[in-house]
């Protein structure tokens, strides 16, 4: 349960202010309240659902989370969070000093929602190209389909948390190391 709250604390607080113009939240989310509920749902999925191996168990847990949202927050917020919203900490461009042109912060970390998966895919493709340019030995040549993108986002979330860790299990050659390199 503490991991859910740790994930909630990672989020950028400015996104929760009412009466302020916000950039798009992603999915069907239209309000700061919906954004908080979407973040809570996302963190519950990362903490509880990602550990399950059976699709039946995952579906049951998903429906339970959705039922809790409906019972607790009402129909309006339930509709806002029906569509999944993905949260990542690598969407922001590097911070550059206007006067000198120096890079002040190469990878600013703000845990926030992505508007859609295409935006994350485009950014991951550009990060992969930058990695390939800078690495002399290891090259990444990944096809980033939806499952690969969501796995990469999960790994990036774990790496951004204090004492975050993961045990990556899978068949050799399935992309565990490559996705971790990209997420880092």
PLM ranges: what are they?
Residues 182:
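Active-site signature of alpha/beta-hydrolase-fold catalytic machinery across serine-
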Residues 160-179:
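Walker A/P-loop nucleotide-binding motif
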Residues 1-163:
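Alpha-helical lid/collar subdomain of P-loop NTPases
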């Amino acid at each position: 349960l503490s991991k859910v709250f740790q994930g909630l604390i990672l989020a950028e607080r400015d996104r929760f202010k009412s009466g302020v113009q916000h950039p798009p939240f992603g999915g069907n989310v239209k309000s700061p309240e919906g954004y908080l509920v979407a973040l809570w749902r996302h963190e519950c999925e990362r903490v509880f659902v990602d550990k399950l191996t059976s699709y039946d168990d995952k579906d049951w847990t998903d429906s339970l989370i959705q039922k809790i949202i409906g019972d607790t927050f009402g129909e309006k917020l339930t509709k806002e969070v029906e569509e999944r919203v993905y949260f990542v900490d690598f969407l922001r461009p590097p911070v550059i000093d206007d006067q000198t042109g120096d890079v002040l912060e190469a990878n600013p970390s703000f845990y926030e929602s992505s508007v859609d998966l295409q935006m994350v895919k485009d950014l991951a493709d550009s990060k992969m190209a930058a990695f390939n340019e800078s690495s002399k030995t290891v090259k990444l040549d990944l096809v980033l389909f939806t499952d690969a993108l969501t796995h990469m986002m999960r790994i990036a979330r774990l790496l951004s948390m204090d004492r975050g860790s993961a045990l990556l299990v899978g068949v050799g050659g399935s992309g565990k190391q490559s996705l971790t390199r990209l997420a880092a």
